[in-house]
């Protein structure tokens, strides 16, 4: 394939049509640019053997004409178009099957899949939680099993795929729901014992399916994520799996098959704004994303560099504000206090997907990536170069808020606009208020809403002045009576489901749990 011209930030853009399949799109490791694989191999492997993350060799371009055409399509057809650009080794029929199996009215309560709500003054809420587990992770994890099985069939036929997941709450349940009873797969989810909401824990520990397992660890999400990465890159363990015709893969956002579907909803959102006459094609928008592992906002960055006219990427953090500090100073330092907050899915100090962004911003210099992330592993910190700092500041704004400010934002949204949001969305609301006050920027803005408020019922109820008493199900009923927002059946039905998984282990025992589960 002819290599496209470089774009700013180190990313290159490929101007081939999304409707044509070619042999062009390969994926390379952020730590070894010479390691190149097909999209099917990248999705099956999850992570490169050198510990790097797979990124596309180039980004497919969306022209203004493409965006105008996408505005006339529904969500599934927009997804088909985007995937056809990234997954060039898949057939059109395979992509259509994956898309139609994921984005339908059996899995999502809205036929629009993602709901775009106009709040006030050119500010919109993108609700990504109308899927089966009431969190934005469904947007990717309803399609990932189909992408993975199609990939495995092509790259490792006959192998059983073992999915390992570290979760701070939402990914675990969404992955379990997506992979339950999928032939040829097993899935094991690790979560921090005291680092998820009661509703998130209940969702995971009651999960049905013959091929699923869930285990708590005594530690935080970073411990779980580090443990899973260590297991993935253990060559001796990989050899044992190979002897048993098994192969590890990931459902975390380190897997490109998780990230690509997230790019879709940013492209679709802009197309929807154009379709509804809220913006004219080419008008800029800002995007505000509450994030801990950086995957959700990275997807917006990729959409921007494909051609979606996103002006500012606003990164919203809770008290674990390592990303805020990094965007403002260029210093990433996880040597700090870890806080358990009311927005637990963002209680993260090691943001894995930042590696992909830095690979783009440093001109795809894999040696620099290896140096920075080697330093992070050894010392817990690194500092990027001045050129990368400048690019960060040009594209991103970082802000954070504490729990009291989060609850105040929930209350203000409810009182002013009769809009009930969850704790993570409230972090984004508060950070956007700070950004707008600080900059005076009135560009139309989309705030990403990542979870149903009922997933964090106690905190939301307390925020709007309700009485926090009884169990979580009584609080759901109280929240429903106060807000009028229907309780999702997926959450209300948990009350009568039996707990299947109650195991809790030290973080050092994670590999033992995996070996026991697999009978190795």
Q: For each predicted feature, which ranges?
A:
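PLP-dependent amino-acid enzyme catalytic core
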Residues: 3-6, 13-15, 20-520
């Amino acid at each position: 394939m002819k290599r496209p011209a470089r774009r700013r930030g180190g990313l290159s853009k490929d101007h081939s049509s999304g409707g044509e399949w070619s042999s062009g799109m390969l994926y390379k490791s952020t730590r070894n640019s010479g390691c190149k694989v097909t999209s099917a191999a990248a999705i099956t492997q999850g992570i490169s053997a050198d510990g790097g993350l797979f990124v596309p060799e180039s980004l497919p371009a969306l022209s203004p004409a493409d965006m105008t055409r996408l505005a006339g399509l529904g969500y599934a057809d927009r997804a088909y178009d985007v995937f056809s650009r990234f997954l060039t080794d898949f057939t059109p029929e395979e992509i259509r099957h994956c898309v139609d199996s994921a984005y339908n009215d059996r899995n999502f309560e809205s036929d629009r899949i993602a709901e775009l709500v106009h709040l006030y003054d050119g500010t919109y809420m993108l609700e990504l939680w109308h899927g089966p587990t009431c969190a934005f992770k469904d947007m990717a994890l309803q399609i990932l099993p189909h992408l993975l099985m199609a990939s495995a069939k092509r790259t490792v036929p006959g192998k059983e795929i073992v999915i390992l997941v570290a979760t701070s709450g939402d990914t675990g349940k969404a992955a379990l729901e997506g992979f339950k009873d999928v032939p040829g797969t097993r899935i094991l989810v690790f979560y921090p014992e005291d680092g998820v909401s009661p509703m998130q824990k209940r969702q995971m520990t009651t999960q049905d399916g013959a091929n699923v397992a869930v285990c708590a660890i005594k530690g935080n999400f970073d411990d779980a994520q580090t443990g899973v990465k260590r297991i993935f890159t253990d060559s001796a363990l990989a050899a044992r799996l190979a002897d048993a015709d098994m192969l590890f893969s990931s459902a975390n956002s380190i897997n490109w098959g998780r990230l690509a579907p997230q790019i879709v909803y940013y492209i679709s959102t802009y197309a929807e704004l154009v379709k509804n006459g809220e913006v004219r094609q080419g008008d800029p928008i800002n995007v505000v994303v509450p994030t801990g592992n950086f995957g959700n906002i990275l997807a917006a960055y990729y959409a921007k560099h494909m051609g979606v006219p996103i002006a500012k990427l606003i990164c919203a953090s809770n008290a674990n504000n390592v990303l805020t500090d990094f965007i403002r100073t260029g210093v990433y330092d996880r040597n700090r206090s870890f806080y358990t907050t009311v927005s637990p899915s963002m209680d993260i100090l090691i943001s894995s997907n930042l590696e992909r962004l830095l690979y783009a911003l440093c001109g795809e210099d894999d040696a620099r990536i290896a140096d920075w992330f080697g330093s992070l592993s050894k010392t817990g910190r690194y500092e990027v170069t001045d050129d990368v700092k400048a690019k960060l500041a040009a594209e991103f704004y970082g802000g954070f808020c504490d729990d009291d400010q989060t609850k105040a934002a929930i209350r203000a949204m409810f009182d002013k606009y009769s809009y009930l949001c969850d704790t993570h969305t409230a972090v984004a609301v508060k950070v956007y208020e700070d950004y707008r006050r600080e900059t005076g920027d009135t560009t139309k803005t989309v705030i990403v809403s990542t979870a149903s408020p009922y997933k964090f019922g106690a905190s939301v109820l307390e925020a709007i002045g309700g009485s926090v008493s009884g169990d979580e199900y009584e609080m759901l009923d109280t929240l429903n009576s106060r807000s009028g927002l229907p309780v999702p059946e997926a959450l209300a039905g948990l009350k009568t489901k039996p707990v299947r998984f109650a195991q809790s282990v030290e973080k050092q025992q994670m590999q033992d749990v995996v070996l026991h589960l697999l009978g190795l």
